[in-house]
Amino acid sequence: MMRIALFLLTNLGVMVVFGLILSLTGIQSSSVMGLMIMAGLFGFGGAFVSLLMSKWMALRSVGGEVIEQPRNETERWLLDTIAKQSQQAGIAMPQVAIYHAPDINAFATGARRDASLVAVSTGLLQNMSRDEAEAVLAHEVSHIANGDMVTMTLIQGIVNTFVIFISRILAQLAAGFMSGDREEEGNSNGNPMVYFVVSMVLELVFGIVASTITMWFSRHREFHADAGAARLAGSEKMIAALQRLKTSYEPQEASSMMALCINGKSKSISELFMSHPPLDKRIEALRSGQYAR
């Protein structure tokens, strides 16, 4: 909760300062405060709703089935291993689910450290050794212990808010400039069509730029989760698991799920837009101890 409060206060403070600067420069309209509130509600609202519904949406997306009672030795091993790692990491036992997919993958999600979910693919269970699978599970438990889902949501909320706010402000200025004396027209946004088109274009452009910020954090947290897995399961097991991921099918999970999974899509225009670092970089970081605490 402290992390959420600090992020919200920081975001609010920056927005207020930005509003004051607009006021002092005289380019602010009477609707800026309302726009600030609207941007915050939409920017954070969508991100937090997604977080609160994350377990349900993730299970629905992959068709996962939560293990209520283990039906075989593999399911028993999964529960026992995650229970042990959760205790080591100081978090409550997460729910554990299995979903059908040929690729070697797993993910963790949930709104709180003590109300989370770890899901693994059948491809992982069929193609990884127990040591490798143990390391992958430790990676997911580390994500939960680090609070990565909440932090990712807060960062997404902040960038969403600023994308909406700044694009609308600039669109308002552009529309007012192109329509001449907007006050005579009684329309603080100037030409409505210009305002709409410019705001949509700017939201698209700023959204692409903002995605590089969230993807940078996503890559950063993968390195730390790998390091956490090395502490829980051993660095050699984690390196072996990452080596095994090189042999996997291209991930089949939906694009919206990729940032949650241990094995992200390797094909991208640029590493800037990748949710995961290249596997070789992750292995190198483990061997060098770069992210070890």
Curated annotation (Swiss-Prot):
Details of cofactor binding: Binds 1 zinc ion per subunit.
Recorded GO CC terms: plasma membrane
TM region positions: 4-24, 32-52, 158-178, 193-213
Disulfide bonds: none
Gene Ontology molecular function: any one: metalloendopeptidase activity
E.C. designation(s): 3.4.24.-
Signal peptide range: none
Domain of life per record: Bacteria
Positions of the catalytic residues: 140
Keyword tags: Cell inner membrane, Cell membrane, Hydrolase, Membrane, Metal-binding, Metalloprotease, Protease, Transmembrane, Transmembrane helix, Zinc
One Gene Ontology biological process: proteolysis
Membrane topology: Multi-pass membrane protein
Main location: membrane
Cofactor: Zn(2+)
Residues that, per the record, bind Zn(2+): 139, 143, 222
Cellular compartments annotated: Cell inner membrane
Presence of keyword Ribonucleoprotein: no
Alphabetical list of PANTHER family matching this protein: PROTEASE HTPX
Family named by the database record: Belongs to the peptidase M48B family.
Protein name: Protease HtpX
Gene that specifies this protein: htpX
